[in-house]
């Protein structure tokens, strides 16, 4: 499944009017859309000149979530993207930026792998302008907390849509 685009969850989209499925690397004017990379496609992506590149990249030294950094596999790296003004990628849950690369992140935290990572929401990009990020202030939040801290600061810690993993550090 990692070496093919034959089976994917978005395939149903081709039957919806107004949606175009991009299943091959596609350039339209100054925009390049890159589906899941297979084979040696990663070798040509960084050299493709464009203003905007959108992809589903697994770049080393970026965090997949709030705790786990993507290891270097010896393939595509952030430093390979020298011919693009902006590179936007999905795939990783954490919103983050390095140089011209923007990982958009998920619109909301999903589980305890996203502890303390509240910069979630959406991004709007108007062609020719800077991307604008919006945080969803009322998104679900995940926290790890000691019971003693929770008891001392209950009102500060417990908020709407707060998921708490409580560690027992005192006798109950």
Where are these regions (language model features)?
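Extended recognition/assembly regions associated with phosphoester-bond processing machinery
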Residues: 1-172
């Amino acid at each position: 499944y990692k070496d093919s685009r034959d089976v994917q969850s978005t395939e149903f989209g081709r039957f919806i009017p107004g949606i175009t499925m991009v299943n091959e690397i596609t350039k339209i004017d100054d925009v390049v859309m890159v589906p899941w990379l297979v084979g040696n496609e990663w070798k040509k992506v960084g050299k493709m000149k464009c203003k905007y590149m959108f992809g589903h990249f697994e770049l080393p030294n970026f965090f997949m979530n709030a705790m786990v950094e993507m290891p270097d596999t010896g393939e595509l790296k952030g430093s390979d993207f020298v011919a693009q003004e902006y590179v936007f990628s999905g795939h990783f849950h954490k919103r983050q930026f390095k140089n011209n690369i923007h990982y958009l992140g998920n619109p909301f935290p999903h589980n305890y792998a996203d502890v303390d990572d509240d910069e979630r929401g959406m991004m709007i990009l108007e062609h020719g302008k800077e991307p604008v990020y919006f945080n969803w202030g009322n998104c679900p939040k995940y926290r790890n907390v000691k019971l003693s801290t929770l008891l001392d600061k209950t009102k500060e810690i417990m908020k709407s849509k707060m998921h708490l993993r409580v560690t027992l550090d005192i006798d109950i």
